[in-house]
């Protein structure tokens, strides 16, 4: 929840979700 994954999720889901990232405020975060 605090580390940006360098990916946005405005139009598509986080592809980095496989790495433990989740969408928050239109940006993918990890932890």
From Swiss-Prot:
The keyword Disulfide bond applies. Disulfide bonds join 5-21, 9-23, 14-28. This is Cyclotide mden-N. This is a cyclic peptide. It holds the Pfam family Cyclotide. InterPro entries: Cyclotide, Cyclotide_bracelet_CS, Cyclotide_sf. It comes from Melicytus dentatus (Tree violet). The lineage of its organism: Eukaryota, Viridiplantae, Streptophyta, Embryophyta, Tracheophyta. There is a cross-link at residues 1-31 (Cyclopeptide (Gly-Asn)). The presence of a 'disulfide through disulfide knot' structurally defines this protein as a knottin.
């Amino acid at each position: 929840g605090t580390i940006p994954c360098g990916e946005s999720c405005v139009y598509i889901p986080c592809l980095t979700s496989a790495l433990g990232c989740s969408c928050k405020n239109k940006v993918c975060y990890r932890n």
